Amino acid sequence: MSRELMVETGGELIGNTPLLKLNKIGKDLGASIAVKVEYMNPACSVKDRIAFNMIDTAEKAGLITPGKTVLIEPTSGNMGIALAYCGKLRGYKVILTMPASMSIERRCLLKAYGAEVILTDPATAVKGAVQRAEELRDVIPNAYILNQFGNPANPEAHYKTTGPEIWRQTQGKVDIVCFGVGSGGTCTGVGRFLKEKNPSVQVFPVEPFESSVINGLPHSPHKIQGMGTGMIPDILDLTLFSEALRVHSDDAIAMAKKLADEESILGGISSGANVCAAVQLAKRPENKGKLIVTTVNSFGERYLSTALYAELRDNAANMKQLNLDDSIKIAKEYLGI
């Protein structure tokens, strides 16, 4: 849907996000890097696309009914927020199961959209949230799990929207895409579309260094919320990929801060991981002159309570009202004068 016209429903606001070249972070790397700014979706993340498509597809198949079906879904946060948003639009009660390690902002946003939140043991990661969702479905009347990790409507959303948008916005000149793997929908859907358009396009999944299950390594705790669930999702099409890239949590956090500082892009930790991976690829000699596209998955405000903004949060909490002299002193220190 064009953003130049008035729309009738909130669902029509989803998609057609801007593609922005990283002029500072991408400078002198050999290849160019551009990001799809997915926090421009109405519920501020890439997951808006799949939540809407999964509900729409299930409705058309007669699997769910507004005002009757209760939607239950395991999530690390952004999918839950998107589903709460789309569920509210379409007339559904929504219950989300989520590891207790996810940020407080996620819980607040879910509640703000009218969803119920059930926290699960963080030690069991997303697998524990999946199990709890299934247990709830079995005892709640008219409950239905859309199952982002196994639902073909997830990658289909990206095949129908994100992939074509990237192709159009780059005028078919995209060479490489890389995306963090949570449910695997972006990598699979975008990769499938672009490879149909140009088989030479390379697709790279991205996972936390600490939880590199696609690379055959064990899952362990990490700080990149929304990625590295500890399992390989059913919808992830491994045949599309050139190589699974690994990004350390601390590097992802540092890059998220760098995005805000140098490019004025306030994204989350997974967005930092995506750009870290893009920088890895841009530095490879064989990619000189190529165009690499990734996503800024979600808006940074929902990460204020995480390790990403720990120092700033402590600073803000300790701020005090100042007199004029101290105000001038602080202002001069900030300006370096």
UniProtKB/Swiss-Prot annotation:
GO biological process: cysteine biosynthetic process from serine
Catalytic activity, as annotated: hydrogen cyanide + L-cysteine = 3-cyano-L-alanine + hydrogen sulfide + H(+); O-acetyl-L-serine + hydrogen sulfide = L-cysteine + acetate
GO molecular function: cysteine synthase activity; L-3-cyanoalanine synthase activity
EC number annotated for this UniProt entry: 2.5.1.47, 4.4.1.9
Keyword Disulfide bond: no
Amino-acid biosynthesis found in the keyword field: yes
Modified residues (N6-(pyridoxal phosphate)lysine): K47
Key words, A-Z: Amino-acid biosynthesis, Cysteine biosynthesis, Lyase, Pyridoxal phosphate, Transferase
Entry GO CC: cytoplasm
Binding residue positions for pyridoxal 5'-phosphate: N78, G182, S183, G184, G185, T186, S270
InterPro entries documented for this protein: Cys_synth, Cys_Synth/Cystath_Beta-Synth, CysK, P-phosphate_BS, TrpB-like_PALP, TrpB-like_PALP_sf
Subunit: Homodimer.
Function: Primarily catalyzes the formation of cyanoalanine and hydrogen sulfide from cysteine and hydrogen cyanide. Can also catalyze, although less efficiently, the formation of cyanoalanine and hydrogen sulfide from either S-sulfocysteine or O-acetylserine and hydrogen cyanide and the formation of cysteine from either S-sulfocysteine or O-acetylserine and hydrogen sulfide. By catalyzing the assimilation of cyanide produced by P.aeruginosa, mediates resistance to infection. Involved in fertility, growth and aging. Does not mediate survival in high levels of hydrogen sulfide.
UniProt protein name: Bifunctional L-3-cyanoalanine synthase/cysteine synthase
Organism: Caenorhabditis elegans
Lineage of source species: Eukaryota, Metazoa, Ecdysozoa, Nematoda, Chromadorea
